[in-house]
Amino acid sequence: MRPAGRSNNQVRPVTLTRNYTKHAEGSVLVEFGDTKVLCTASIEEGVPRFLKGQGQGWITAEYGMLPRSTHTRNAREAAKGKQGGRTMEIQRLIARALRAAVDLKALGEFTITLDCDVLQADGGTRTASITGACVALVDALQKLVENGKLKTNPMKGMVAAVSVGIVNGEAVCDLEYVEDSAAETDMNVVMTEDGRIIEVQGTAEGEPFTHEELLILLALARGESNPL
């Protein structure tokens, strides 16, 4: 029996509250069960130096966890003086996923920064961040259209992410912390709204997984990411 009695292919209740803050061009509070992440999208004119003069925009991301988003307090990375490897990996994943959803040429020379701050962690913070940041990004891009800086919204399509894994020998989706910490296989899948894959991160925590199990997990992710 899974936590809260969920079936193996059932995601936790998902809530997306738009315009959660008033200053950012796009802001969303995304909730996957007890995992809560604040996602904001901020627009700046101009692009990084390596893109200047190329007539295209850029999307980048930052990710962080509040000190008491977890069971015990974790010091802020700013206080430590450096970002951890996990943080850098996740924020690069968020940025890659959302760049795949936008026509960067149509965006023009604007930079959009996606900030994903975990308020409460109960598994799946990176997948929740991608899903929430996508909605914040759509709203920010629409502001550029409404302000007359873009003719059309350069968003090519929506993106969502979901975690899947093998727990106690069974394939399950949207793992909570207690499942994630005990999973034999842990995988994060980022997909477009039409079911195409942007990125797959999969790790065997114990026993290696088979090709057949990989296909089962991808099918499970595809089935559950579309409603998101």
UniProtKB/Swiss-Prot annotation:
What is one GO biological process annotated to this record?
Answer: rRNA catabolic process
Specify the domain of life of the species encoding this protein: Bacteria
* Effect of deleting the gene: When the gene is deleted the strain no longer inhibits 5'-processing of pre-tRNAs with short (<5 nucleotide) leaders in the absence of rppH. The truncated allele encoded by this protein has a slight growth defect, which is slightly exacerbated when combined with an rppH deletion. The truncated allele suppresses the loss of viability conferred by deletion of RNase 2 (rnb) during stationary phase at 31 and 42 degrees Celsius or starvation at 42 degrees Celsius.
* Residue sites binding phosphate per the record: 86, 124-126
Q: Which residues cross the membrane?
A: none
User: Could you tell me what induces this protein?
Assistant: The catalytically inactive protein is present at significantly lower levels than restored wild-type protein (at protein level).
Pfam families from the entry?
RNase_PH (PF01138), RNase_PH_C (PF03725)
**Keyword terms:** RNA-binding, rRNA processing, tRNA processing, tRNA-binding
- Give the GO cellular component terms, alphabetically: cytosol
Query: SUPFAM superfamilies of this UniProt entry?
Result: Ribonuclease PH domain 2-like, Ribosomal protein S5 domain 2-like
Per its UniProt record, what InterPro entries does this chain match? Answer: ExoRNase_PH_dom1 (IPR001247), ExoRNase_PH_dom2 (IPR015847), ExoRNase_PH_dom2_sf (IPR036345), PNPase/RNase_PH_dom_sf (IPR027408), Ribosomal_Su5_D2-typ_SF (IPR020568), RNase_PH (IPR050080), RNase_PH_bac-type (IPR002381), RNase_PH_CS (IPR018336)
The molecular function GO annotations come to: 3'-5'-RNA exonuclease activity; RNA binding; tRNA binding; tRNA nucleotidyltransferase activity
Q: What does this protein do?
A: This an expressed but non-active exoribonuclease allele. The catalytically inactive protein translated in strain K12 MG1655 inhibits the 5'-processing of primary pre-tRNAs with short (<5 nucleotide) leaders in a dominant-negative effect when RNA pyrophosphohydrolase (rppH) is also inactive; perhaps inactive Rph inhibits interaction with RNase P which is exacerbated when RppH cannot cleave the triphosphate of the primary transcript.
Q: How does it assemble?
A: Homodimer. No interaction between the inactive protein and RppH or RNase P was detected by immunoprecipitation.
Q: Which family does it belong to?
A: Belongs to the RNase PH family.
Note, other = The gene in K12 strains MG1655 and W3110 (and also other derivatives of K12 W1485) has a frameshift mutation that leads to loss of activity, although the protein is translated. Thus in those strains rph is an expressed, catalytically inactive protein. In strain K12 / MG1655(Seq)* the wild-type protein has been restored. For the functional protein without the frameshift mutation see AC P0CG18.
Protein's name according to its UniProt entry = Truncated inactive ribonuclease PH
Organism, per UniProt? Escherichia coli (strain K12)
The beginning of the lineage is: Bacteria, Pseudomonadati, Pseudomonadota, Gammaproteobacteria, Enterobacterales
Q: Which gene encodes it?
A: rph
